[in-house]
Curated annotation (Swiss-Prot):
PANTHER family: NADH-UBIQUINONE OXIDOREDUCTASE CHAIN 3. GO terms for molecular function: NADH dehydrogenase (ubiquinone) activity. The keyword ATP-binding does not apply. It comes from Arabidopsis thaliana (Mouse-ear cress). This is NADH-ubiquinone oxidoreductase chain 3. One of its GO terms (cellular component) is NADH dehydrogenase complex.
Length: 119
């Protein structure tokens, strides 16, 4: 029974190893170059920066980006469901409808709370 999950396990192990290698190699070969203050300063096309380059963003930008990611995730679930719609039964159909209903409730809640208003 566990043999059918072997390709998924192998994929996860290989992905983990590649990720760890890609994270570890720069630490092995990088030199400590943070001793120069010029490397830590902001750079704007050869000029001294006019203002602070590390300014804060309004929280609404983060909220809109999170909402975009949530609804982008919805689309990634939507495509496989639409492709396999003729092969799934009513349980698959109503599962997706429940998923869309929960997302719609979340969207309406965010809209009512004023998360999408730019005043």
């Amino acid at each position: 029974m566990m043999l059918e999950f072997a390709p998924i396990f192998i994929y996860l192990v290989i992905s983990l190893l590649v990720s760890l290698i890609l994270l570890g190699v720069p630490f092995l070969f990088a030199s400590n170059s943070s001793t120069y203050p010029e490397k830590l300063s902001a750079y704007e096309c050869g000029f001294d920066p006019f203002g602070d380059a590390r300014s804060r963003f309004d929280i609404r930008f983060y909220l809109v980006s999170i909402l975009f990611l949530i609804f982008d995730l919805e689309v990634t679930f939507f495509f496989p469901w639409a492709v396999s719609l003729n092969k799934i039964d009513l349980f698959g159909f109503w599962s997706m409808m429940a998923f869309l209903f929960i997302l719609t409730i979340g969207f309406l809640y965010e809209w009512k709370r004023g998360a999408l208003d730019w005043e």
